[in-house]
Amino acid sequence: MQAEPKKSQAEQRAVAEPVSEPVSLVGEEYEVEVGPVAHGGHCIARTSEGQVLFVRHTLPGERVVARVTEGEEGARFLRADAVEILDPSKDRIEAPCPFAGPGRCGGCDWQHAKPGAQRRLKGEVVAEQLQRLAGLTPEEAGWDGTVMPAEGDKLPAGQVPSWRTRVQFAVDADGRAGLRRHRSHEIEPIDHCMIAAEGVSELGIERRDWPGMATVEAIAATGSQDRQVILTPRPGARLPIVELDRPVSVMRVGEKDGGVHRVHGRPFVRERADDRTYRVGSGGFWQVHPKAADTLVTAVMQGLLPRKGDMALDLYCGVGLFAGALADRVGDQGAVLGIESGKRAVEDARHNLAAFDRVRIEQGKVESVLPRTGIDEVDLIVLDPPRAGAGRKTVQHLSTLGARRIAYVACDPAALARDLGYFQDGGYRVRTLRVFDLFPMTAHVECVAILEPAAKGL
């Protein structure tokens, strides 16, 4: 019988001395001076021991009592809520929403800040990400630092724009609809969401019981009266009879396949943008703010300045919003190729743009499909990637196609900044950057960066 190897002294100590569990700091309170805003809807502070705190429900320059919500001794950082404001900022207001605040609804980040201050804070986040990840100052990115509100959203302090045309309500064990608390599966029951668009509020989702449902998503299309509800049942649950305050089509998420299936009514809604109607299938992507699609199309087309006869790419094209705008502008002698990974979105894009012989829509991942097309030269590129961004490999490929201008649409300034750095490595420079507040009361923004070959800017 072979003898076991002798344990080292360190191994013997590890057996003799069981490893202690990290000590949770949840619930601990610290009086702190609040520093700058950070990406994600919180501000940075430090404990007296120097540990970093990411604090929600506060503003830069305030002195607050911060209660830890996540983290342990020795962790790189802690998460916390400001539960007492000792020295308030001049930008602080009382949150208009009765469901906002520490431990409450997680749908909004800046209910406690004046609207102008919200936009200023978002601008500071974008500027910090540009500098840190792309090495660009606002001036070098062609941006004046302004975060522009959507048309109609510039309201006095205390008033909240009702902008969210898609709201997914979570349902608790008692069948009550609400919204999830921040970074939690716990549900805050509500009777009204202030940022929900009028068409969503009119349905009365929050005023009904939803037994057996996990989520209820409400959609109110822009430019049509289409209303839709998507139900996600809990395992084994039966669908309730849907009786709402307005006519709706009803879909359900399949328990086995996760697909969205028709119960009754149209399996899509009709959205309107750039003087065109777009069919968007159940579960498909469309901008949530009613002014967002037109705002972004205008910004992209003003930046690209398409010409008759141009060859253009629309990458991550969804249901064809930018491809349609490009097709109108490049004319019969031009061509547009859209690439989208979602099967249903591709079907919708082909339907929406069927009148254009010059538009082709391909299904698949951009990094896989684009090399297979054999395209080695284009005039214009639009890319509107998911939150994670396009990534180094895709940006490197796009940088070889000789595009006269590139429009990058992004909902995450960190991913945008990383990819702008890759474009710079590939010989492009940022000509202009525009930042839009299309998600009021939240930490999110939408950016449109226009790039051109660096040699052109010399």
Swiss-Prot record:
The active site is at C411 (nucleophile). GO terms for biological process: rRNA base methylation. Residues 1-20 are annotated as: Disordered. Its EC number is 2.1.1.-. InterPro entries: MeTrfase_TrmA_CS (IPR030391), NA-bd_OB-fold (IPR012340), SAM-dependent_MTases_sf (IPR029063), TRAM_dom (IPR002792), U5_MeTrfase_fam (IPR010280). Residues 23-84 form the TRAM domain. [4Fe-4S] cluster binds at C97, C105, C108, C193. Keywords: 4Fe-4S, Iron, Iron-sulfur, Metal-binding, Methyltransferase, S-adenosyl-L-methionine, Transferase. GO terms for molecular function: 4 iron, 4 sulfur cluster binding; metal ion binding; rRNA (uridine-C5-)-methyltransferase activity. It is an enzyme of class 2 (transferase). SUPFAM superfamilies: Nucleic acid-binding proteins, S-adenosyl-L-methionine-dependent methyltransferases. It comes from the Bacteria. S-adenosyl-L-methionine binds at Q287, Y316, E340, D384. CDD domains: AdoMet_MTases. Residues 1-10 have a biased composition (Basic and acidic residues). Belongs to the class I-like SAM-binding methyltransferase superfamily. RNA M5U methyltransferase family. This is Uncharacterized RNA methyltransferase SCO5901. The lineage of its organism: Bacteria, Bacillati, Actinomycetota, Actinomycetes, Kitasatosporales.
